Amino acid sequence: MTNRPPPDGSNRPIQLSSEAALDALCADADRVLVEFYTDGCGICSSMEPVLGNLARQLDIAVAQVNPRDDPPLVERFDVRSVPLFVLFVDGDPVARLADGFVPGAELESWVREHSG
């Protein structure tokens, strides 16, 4: 397995539109950080550059998914508030964080702590 940047070569988060797309990405990458967000969430929008920087610094796949696009995601990941960050290692969710805006250094430490 490998981590891969988005197809356009940027470090912007990969936009996922379904549970199947999320599962495929998690199966394909060693480590994946997913932000669950909703349209109109200002904090969620402000996290995008932080996530892009994190992808570059940690060589990790970073994605965003709106659970409203695929409602079973809400139940599967117990999404109660956004942004919700879920870290996957080898396809399995290993940690979750739902603390609003998370500064880059804090999010980087959290990813390192939970991904070995």
At which residue positions do the language-model features occur?
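Haloarchaeal acidic low-complexity proteome signature biased toward cell-envelope/secretome components but also
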Residues: M1-D28, L107-G116
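Short active-site neighborhood of thiol/selenol oxidoreductases, capturing the structured segment around
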Residues: A27-D39
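Hydrophobic beta-strand anchors of alpha/beta hydrolase catalytic cores
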Residues: L33-V34, V62, F85
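The canonical Cys-X-X-Cys-His
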Residues: C41-C44, F85
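Typically the conserved alpha-helix immediately C-terminal to a functionally engaged Cys/Sec
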Residues: I43-L58
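Structural microenvironment flanking redox-active thiols in thiol-disulfide oxidoreductases
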Residues: P67-L73
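Structural micro-motif
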Residues: F77-V86
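Non-catalytic, surface beta->alpha helical segment in thiol-disulfide oxidoreductase systems
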Residues: V86-G116
